[in-house]
Amino acid sequence: MGRREEMIAKIKELMLQPERIRNIGIAAHIDHGKTTLSDNLLAGAGMISEELAGKQLVLDFDEQEQARGITINAANVSMVHNYEGKDYLINLIDTPGHVDFGGDVTRAMRAIDGVIIVVDAVEGVMPQTETVVRQALREYVKPVLFINKVDRLIRELKLTPQQMMERFSKIIMDVNRLIQRYAPEEYKKQWMVKVEDGSVAFGSAYYNWALSVPFMKRTGVKFNEIIDLTLKGDHKTLRQKAPLHVVVLDMVVKHLPNPIEAQKYRIPHLWQGDINSDVGQAMLNCDPKGKMVMVVTKIIIDKHAGEVATGRVWSGTVKSGQEVYLINTKRKARIQQVGIYMGPERINMEAVPAGNIVAVTGLRDAMAGETVAEEPIEPFEALHYVSEPVVTVAIEAKNVKDLPRLIEALRQLAKEDPTLHVKIDEETGQHLLSGMGELHLEVKLYKLKKDWGIDIDVSEPIVVYRESITKPSPMVEGKSPNRHNRFYIVVEPMPDEIYNAIKEGIIPEGRIKNPKEVAKKLAELGMDYEIARGIVDVYNGNMFLDNTKGVQYLNEVMDLLIDGFHQAMDEGPLAKEPVMKVIVRLIDAQVHEDNVHRGPAQIYPAIRTAIHCAMMKSNPVLYEPYQKVIINIPYEYMGAVSREITQRRGQLVDMKQEGEVMTIIAEAPVAEMFGFAGAIRSATSGRALWSTEHAGFKRVPNELAQQIIRQIRQRKGLDPNPPTEKDVCPLF
């Protein structure tokens, strides 16, 4: 039996023993060495050859990732590790560190129970580190810490052991501060990382060595020996004395939970259904004999197998030929092939039980985040994405005959990556693709050209603005065209506390199932409890409340009212841009008794016009997306960089100096950031290292707002003059 067959046999055996499984991820700031770490773990576990690891970047198997040297898609690999005489199956999901791909990180967190946080010893904890730690803890994922690139402290910065220890302590303190801030109450203390118990390891993923206190105690290897070998450049001996994969995977097995342990506390948090039901108990106990439930975390399109859905099996067993329900899309499907991962390749299996990461084909309508089950159940909570699409490009096929394929290609892209939004502009016939940043869209468009071979014209990137209001409106009446239905509403600006609670997932998006509980939370955030009890729907950071008393037939049209509310929020009155931070309250209504007179054609315009008219009476304003920019540069380029930022309406938020290196943190409007990459490169002769992340929305200065509204309206083929209250409010 060859090495490969042995490995497959071992994986088959271990996947049936959930206490021997660890589902983990690696998360870090861009370029802190995450993919190099995962490759060297794979090599150590015998999945790829050692010489290639680190240079090979197995997980970056998309040619774009290898060209750009960053990880774009979270891929999954499995490996076997022996700890204290027992074999363990470790499923490792690699996640991107670049902010434009934050959606992948969020989805991967759903499938894993533990995460290795990688921090560069030279740079320390960075903004993106904070983002990934927050995402992990929000999904109840337990962290351990790997401090990487320690060789640079020894060789480049020439620090003494004492200085290095100080550097490590600071990083550990910073990470623990994040855990303290974001971990669930009951785990704030328990999940702190400590050098003494081995939940912290440090080393060099590139040179393939690592140390932890338990490893040093067990083997007698001293830190000073490692320093000497590093200074001599004897990497081979280093690798043999302190092999990276042994130290890191030992830490994983010892400190990160198996699926049986993890599901006990994760399921009640991630799943909204009844924990005491049969399926609830099966998931709590990770029971392979229960009803099958899995959550899809990623869809990839494979040239041979078609759509492959990767996901986590929470209970039961996934078998080929099984008939399943896709809960969110409300469709049935039949599972065709079932497999698990070995390295990056999929190995077909007959069946895969609870606690594993599975790859299946046959779920044609599934999207990432879909709950797949043997029978209809409550879906898992919606995935929370950290940022939202802020940049749009318009796409047209150069050749008209490619149009049907372009539509199909865009549909597939949006399925693979739910953080992409695809919209067809009915008026111009253009396809609008919105993403989380310039790089995100660039990568997706490259994929579209390469995988589908379609020639396309792409517009300059356009920023997605938001519309909002600054004061409460008076009561406004909306009438249906047949005048038989009337709705009386007011709109109010949403307080920041409530908006942030929605963004952090404390207040759920979508139709509200348990208004009393949500009202309690809203009351804690300062809303009047009596008003809050009327909460019906939360949509893209806006809220719809029913504060009527005893209106007949209102329930019959509530779904239509919510649809109309969504339409009004998708396109605001100023420039048809999405609306944010608006609370719409229905105060009173008259609804016709005969449902012929209260269909969509009557209700939609009534509620939509009323909301837009009320917004025009509430001092409507435009918001624009901002980016946080983190730049590392040699000290002498300080002036050039701050000029570059202030020219772009940006502000410096913070500056830190370590040795010769300055770290500048700034915020600037996305609209001004196009072409920043080239500008910063020439301003610093290519010496700047920089990354960006979404920094929310800020109000557009008044002197620019009118001009921007005109530009947006012109681009959309509307009358360029900004509308007045008279234009929007009907003359009833």
Curated annotation (Swiss-Prot):
GO terms for molecular function: GTP binding; GTPase activity; translation elongation factor activity. GO terms for cellular component: cytosol; ribonucleoprotein complex. Keywords: Cytoplasm, Elongation factor, GTP-binding, Nucleotide-binding, Protein biosynthesis. InterPro entries: EFG_II, EFG_III/V, EFG_V-like, EFTu-like_2, G_TR_CS, P-loop_NTPase, Ribosomal_Su5_D2-typ_SF, Ribsml_uS5_D2-typ_fold_subgr. The modification Diphthamide is found at H597. Residues 19-260 form the tr-type G domain. GTP binds at residues 28-35, 94-98, 148-151. Coiled coil: none annotated. Its main location: cytoplasm. It is found in: Cytoplasm. It comes from the Archaea. Belongs to the TRAFAC class translation factor GTPase superfamily. Classic translation factor GTPase family. EF-G/EF-2 subfamily. Catalyzes the GTP-dependent ribosomal translocation step during translation elongation. During this step, the ribosome changes from the pre-translocational (PRE) to the post-translocational (POST) state as the newly formed A-site-bound peptidyl-tRNA and P-site-bound deacylated tRNA move to the P and E sites, respectively. Catalyzes the coordinated movement of the two tRNA molecules, the mRNA and conformational changes in the ribosome. This is Elongation factor 2. It comes from Pyrococcus abyssi (strain GE5 / Orsay).
